[in-house]
């Protein structure tokens, strides 16, 4: 998974004990003994995520990414995946697309290697996250594909947090529910701005309970059977003085156990 909320590249290792960590048996494993480009590093690595912690050690090898090939990339070989969460996720490893400031063990980020190799048309990347799922979503390296957007981009400067430039952190001017401002971005330590992290590694909207409570109250209840989905208000985020609407279908999670089961909805 390509995760803008973290900055390390790691893959599950063939050295993972499947009897102790069953999740390793559910994924493709990297075996460095089969690589002629592998170089040992050996430094221990621990990677904390909101979904769980995994650990292992650093290694070096050639990274092939789309049609790019980059030698001597330092990455994590994970041989410990405790907990059920790693068994349930559909991906094998994580490619951190965050800034260097949050990289564990201060290793270079995967995208930093691409920039240093001067292989890109521009030092940018973009995501198109499709409502139809992963099969139709796109990561573009070195720019943005015009087939996936209309109009002009709104450019926003990244912000630091406690002096650390690690997350894709931007300032939000306001949050409106059904066109009404609730003053959610007032009274923050950063002034009258909401600091927001753009994180492709999570599919939910999160925030401080105190700030979210009036927002949730204004949205109202979501029927578990999804029957009132189309009556819910838009959430409008204001960035750089421009409004961006989020329709209910994009902030309500619809899920069902199988094709024969009814849809169930909840805020997300």
Spell out what each predicted region is.
Residues 1-82, 86, 90, 218, ...:
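Signature of the N-terminal lobe/flap region of pepsin-like aspartyl proteases
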Residues 2, 74-81, 129-133, 190-192, ...:
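Aspartic protease catalytic domain
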Residues 35, 49-55, 116-117, 163-164, ...:
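Short linear motifs in intrinsically disordered
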Residues 53-57, 101, 105, 206:
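Soluble non-cytosolic domains of exported or imported proteins
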Residues 56, 107-108, 168, 209-212:
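Generic preference for well-ordered alpha-helical elements
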Residues 62-190, 257-268:
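Aspartyl protease catalytic domain
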């Amino acid at each position: 998974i390509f995760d803008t909320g973290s900055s390390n590249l790691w893959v599950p290792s063939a050295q993972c004990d499947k009897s102790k960590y069953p999740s390793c048996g559910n994924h493709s494993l990297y075996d460095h003994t089969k690589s002629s480009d592998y170089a040992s590093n050996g430094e221990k690595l621990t990677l904390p995520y909101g979904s769980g912690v995994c650990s292992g050690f650093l290694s070096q090898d050639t990274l092939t990414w789309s049609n790019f090939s980059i030698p001597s990339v330092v990455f994590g070989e994970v041989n410990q995946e405790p907990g059920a969460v790693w068994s349930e996720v559909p991906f094998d490893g994580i490619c951190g697309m965050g800034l260097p400031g949050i990289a564990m063990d201060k290793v270079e980020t995967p995208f930093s290697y691409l920039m240093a190799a001067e292989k890109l048309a521009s030092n940018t990347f973009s995501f198109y996250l499709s409502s139809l799922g992963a099969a139709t979503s796109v990561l573009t390296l070195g720019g943005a594909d015009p087939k996936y957007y209309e109009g002009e981009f709104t450019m926003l400067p990244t912000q630091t947090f406690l002096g650390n430039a690690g997350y894709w952190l931007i300032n939000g001017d306001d949050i409106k529910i059904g066109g009404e401002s609730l003053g959610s971005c007032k009274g923050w330590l950063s002034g009258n701005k909401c600091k927001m992290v753009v994180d492709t590694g999570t599919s939910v909207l999160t925030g401080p309970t105190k700030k979210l409570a009036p927002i949730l109250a204004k949205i109202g209840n979501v029927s578990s059977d999804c029957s009132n989905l189309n009556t819910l208000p838009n959430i409008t985020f204001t960035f750089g003085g421009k409004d961006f609407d989020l329709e209910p279908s994009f902030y309500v999670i619809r899920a069902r156990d199988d094709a024969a089961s009814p849809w169930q909805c909840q805020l997300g």
